[in-house]
Amino acid sequence: MATKNEEILRKPDWLKIKLNTNENYIGLKKMMREKNLHTVCEEAKCPNIHECWGARRTATFMILGAVCTRACRFCAVKTGLPNELDLNEPERVAESVELMNLKHVVITAVARDDLRDAGSNVYAETVRKVRERNPFTTIEILPSDMGGDYEALETLMASKPDILNHNIETVRRLTPRVRARATYERTLEFLRRSKELQPDIPTKSSLMVGLGETIEEIYETMDDLRANDVDILTIGQYLQPSRKHLKVEKYYTPLEFGKLRKVAMDKGFKHCEAGPMVRSSYHADEQVNEAAKEKHRLGEEKLQQN
């Protein structure tokens, strides 16, 4: 018999979605396996994969392998000892972006604390190869904190992505429990330095709620991000990937997410997505700056001509 606590935390109706595994989705998944590529959309069990891959022509590639050197207690990505770097991965990602005809691509990576450069050189080369082959596709990067190696960050920012995304994930108090190998202050410093290196590139971060934080702590995190010149914020519901991961302490209602979005915009964020199903890359194609939107427009014109 379920306990009272389990009854309260039963997944609410607004989190139950019908997955549309259409032919486009199945075909793209087959191509990923054939090219030995990984998307965080699949690895992290994102609920929006069908909308992004189909209707919005966006996808998030996970590079530097499929095994992470960290074991964050919210994340579904495999952890352990990673394989050797695949130096052909940048070209394969670029080719796949072209074949998928993506409007916007997010390039994320597992943490590679085992590498001297944290994987930054292969990461930057992936951005360059994608841009060479797909001049009208906007590129967002979502790196780890690179172990606090700011030479690695300089390498990444020199590749000139259209958005730099680095996730705060949770509030200050919960950070040691949620992601023990990262620190709250290092995340803020990473975001601040990114903006200092490339002031014209929008910076972005994401916050999960439902891990036991208070509303006041959420507002404090918003203030901390704005104090470090973060432009874009996404806020979504934490969902427990398995019983081995942290439990959900609270399910926020769509109305509560609406209020969080309003507060974020009032605090000065240029763009905020907030909702039960929102993830870091949700509607990412809408968050680029005006110069990047011009790329989208030119790309659409080229598509129509073809």
Swiss-Prot record:
EC number: 2.8.1.8
Binding residues annotated for [4Fe-4S] cluster 2, in chain numbering: C68, C72, C75
SUPFAM superfamilies xref list: Radical SAM enzymes (SSF102114)
Residues that, per the record, bind [4Fe-4S] cluster 1: C41, C46, C52, S281
InterPro entries: Aldolase_TIM (IPR013785), Elp3/MiaA/NifB-like_rSAM (IPR006638), LIAS_N (IPR031691), Lipoyl_synth (IPR003698), rSAM (IPR007197)
One cellular component (GO) term of this entry: cytoplasm
Gene3D superfamilies: Aldolase class I (3.20.20.70)
Ranges where the record places region Disordered: 283-306
Cofactor note: Binds 2 [4Fe-4S] clusters per subunit. One cluster is coordinated with 3 cysteines and an exchangeable S-adenosyl-L-methionine.
Keyword terms, alphabetized: 4Fe-4S, Cytoplasm, Iron, Iron-sulfur, Metal-binding, S-adenosyl-L-methionine, Transferase
SMART domains: Elp3
Domain Radical SAM core residues, every copy: 54-270
Pfam family, one: Radical_SAM
Cofactor: [4Fe-4S] cluster
Chemical reaction(s) catalysed: [[Fe-S] cluster scaffold protein carrying a second [4Fe-4S](2+) cluster] + N(6)-octanoyl-L-lysyl-[protein] + 2 oxidized [2Fe-2S]-[ferredoxin] + 2 S-adenosyl-L-methionine + 4 H(+) = [[Fe-S] cluster scaffold protein] + N(6)-[(R)-dihydrolipoyl]-L-lysyl-[protein] + 4 Fe(3+) + 2 hydrogen sulfide + 2 5'-deoxyadenosine + 2 L-methionine + 2 reduced [2Fe-2S]-[ferredoxin]
Compartments (UniProt record): Cytoplasm
Family: Belongs to the radical SAM superfamily. Lipoyl synthase family.
Record-given protein name: Lipoyl synthase
